[in-house]
């Protein structure tokens, strides 16, 4: 079958016909419909992500962790034709968090991640999967279901934020978040998904970038009731919550003195390409104002399931928005080029594995 592979730690990507040695015991056969592309995939292609590794016994790694698939051969839980999305991280099998299904909090670091670390991904025509790692997607969601994996990370981060902010009464006098302002740094797919989730929670949302919005970004932020702000022109923000999806300290640190008392900062984006100074005065401000700062990565199966409910809500509440987030579709043969460099105006590019069937 065709698959899109890399050979960590080397740079490069190729479409290749492969044969795998995989056990079928208890597994479900899933045909890949769409593969989403993200910065992690491109980091693997460039060789920048040094933690990438093939599965034992292989000298290559099949890419793919953002996936929408269709069950070909099921079991009692899943039937042929069901749309499914796989959970990315698989536990180490030894720490308590992993044994309790919270491999997103693995304490040993010996987890695997499909298409990233030690396990083949889903950028292939078909894959076998343990049903406990599959999440069913309603057929009415259709292709927008490919957004579930990135959304699961958003759900996890905001669930953590709500839990941690119980340290004080942070809701408004009507028990909602309607009096709170969230600034989301970055207007890529993760930034927009955070913005939609925060709007669903009742926050006033400002999507911030250091450039003007594209037409699609402008339309989406308008339609979800958020505001797009070019931070190179405006410096008067006073957020209660900052969500950084950019990974650039130079975007986050200057905002810290403006965050309101008892506020929170979620660090989600990573780049590893920039250094920025945090002064003693800024640290004092964080201490004196009870500012919470935490990082968040990956998600549990429960976060995926909660994400399904949000996608269903948004498809009805914001008609056309999820569809517009998928800004480009490419064939399998075109995939290497878009994996090497970002498409201009991209929010989410997907590889359509069904294109050859039409």
UniProtKB/Swiss-Prot annotation:
Cofactor needs: Zn(2+)
Single annotated GO MF: zinc ion binding
InterPro entries for this protein: ADH-like_N, Glc_1-DH_arc, Glu_dehyd_C, GroES-like_sf, NAD(P)-bd_dom_sf, Zn_alcohol_dh
Residues binding substrate, per UniProt: 40, 113, 149, 153, 298
Record EC number: 1.1.1.47
Functional description taken from the UniProt entry: Catalyzes the NAD(P)(+)-dependent oxidation of D-glucose to D-gluconate via gluconolactone. Can utilize both NAD(+) and NADP(+) as electron acceptor. Is involved in the degradation of glucose through a non-phosphorylative variant of the Entner-Doudoroff pathway.
Full protein name: Glucose 1-dehydrogenase
Source organism of the structure: Metallosphaera sedula (strain ATCC 51363 / DSM 5348 / JCM 9185 / NBRC 15509 / TH2)
């Amino acid at each position: 079958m065709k698959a899109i592979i890399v050979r960590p730690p080397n740079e490069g990507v190729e479409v290749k016909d492969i044969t795998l040695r995989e056990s079928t015991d208890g597994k479900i056969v899933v045909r890949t419909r769409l593969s989403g592309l993200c910065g992690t995939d491109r980091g693997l292609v460039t060789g920048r992500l040094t933690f990438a590794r093939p599965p034992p016994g292989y000298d290559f790694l099949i890419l793919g962790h953002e996936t929408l698939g269709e069950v070909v051969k099921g079991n009692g839980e899943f039937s042929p034709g069901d749309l499914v999305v796989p959970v990315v991280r698989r536990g180490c099998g030894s720490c308590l968090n992993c044994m309790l299904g919270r491999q997103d909090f693995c304490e040993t670091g010996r987890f695997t991640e499909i298409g990233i670390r030690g396990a083949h991904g889903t950028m292939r025509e078909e894959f076998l999967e343990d049903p406990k790692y599959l999440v069913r997607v309603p057929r009415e969601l259709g292709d927008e279901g490919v957004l579930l994996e990135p959304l699961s990370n958003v759900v996890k981060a905001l669930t953590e934020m709500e839990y941690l902010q119980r340290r004080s009464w942070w809701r408004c006098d009507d028990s909602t978040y309607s009096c709170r302002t969230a600034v989301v740094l970055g207007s890529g797919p993760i930034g927009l998904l955070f913005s939609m989730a925060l709007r669903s929670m009742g926050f006033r949302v400002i999507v911030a970038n250091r450039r003007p919005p594209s037409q699609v970004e402008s339309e989406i932020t308008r339609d979800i009731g958020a505001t797009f702000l070019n931070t190179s022109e405006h410096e008067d923000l006073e957020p209660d919550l900052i969500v950084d999806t950019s990974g650039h300290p130079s975007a986050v640190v200057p905002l810290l003195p403006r965050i309101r008392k008892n506020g929170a900062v979620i660090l989600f984006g990573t780049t590893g390409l920039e250094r920025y100074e945090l002064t003693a005065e800024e640290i004092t401000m964080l201490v004196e104002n009870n500012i919470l700062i935490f990082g968040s990565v990956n998600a549990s199966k429960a976060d995926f399931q909660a994400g399904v409910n949000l996608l269903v809500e948004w498809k009805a509440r914001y008609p056309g928005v999820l569809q517009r987030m998928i800004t480009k579709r490419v064939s399998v043969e075109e995939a290497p080029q878009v994996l090497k460099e970002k498409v201009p105006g991209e929010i989410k590019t997907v590889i359509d594995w069904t294109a050859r069937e039409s």
